């Protein structure tokens, strides 16, 4: 188990509540429950417990990224730190939630984040991210000649082989 609590930020359509659609009640995963619940259960199996050291930062995905961070993620991180008595959190963001995590790091309070983990986050925009998701090939070859691209590619391959050997108990 990690030393810091996890704050998970779901992706587009991953939050449902009165702030998103009036009359739907308190925040939850809503229709995305079947998508996110298995991930939460994996974190539970690693020793994380919801509302103890695992928290969900729901938000109104119709708002801009910065507005969502300001209204939802930033206050949630502050509440988690106060509740757990820690000075840092681990942010895990899926898809649009990863963009909120990145905005938090860039414009809010990065010193309070031990790690930012982005899963399926469209950092290059949704169209470019789709090519990786659908088959791993970029539609133009100039990118493959780029030094930064090749460095990231090698880094991901090394990351995969290193963490593939680590067993999670």
Residue ranges and their predicted role:
Residues 1-149:
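N-terminal non-catalytic accessory region
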Residues 141-169:
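Alpha/beta-hydrolase-fold enzymes
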């Amino acid at each position: 188990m990690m030393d810091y609590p996890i704050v998970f930020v779901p992706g587009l359509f991953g939050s449902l509540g009165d702030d998103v659609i009036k009359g739907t009640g308190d925040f939850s995963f809503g229709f995305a429950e079947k998508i996110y619940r298995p991930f939460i259960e994996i974190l539970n199996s690693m020793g994380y417990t919801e509302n103890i050291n695992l928290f969900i930062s729901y938000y109104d995905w119709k708002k801009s990224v910065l507005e969502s961070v300001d209204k939802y993620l930033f206050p949630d991180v502050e509440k988690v730190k106060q509740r757990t008595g820690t000075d840092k959190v681990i942010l895990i963001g899926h898809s649009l939630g990863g963009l909120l995590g990145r905005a938090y790091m860039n414009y809010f309070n990065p010193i309070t984040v031990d790690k930012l983990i982005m899963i399926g986050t469209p950092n290059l925009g949704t169209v470019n991210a789709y090519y990786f998701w659908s088959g791993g090939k970029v539609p133009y070859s100039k990118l493959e000649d780029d030094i930064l691209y090749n460095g990231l590619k090698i880094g991901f391959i090394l990351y995969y082989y290193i963490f593939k050997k680590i067993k999670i108990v």
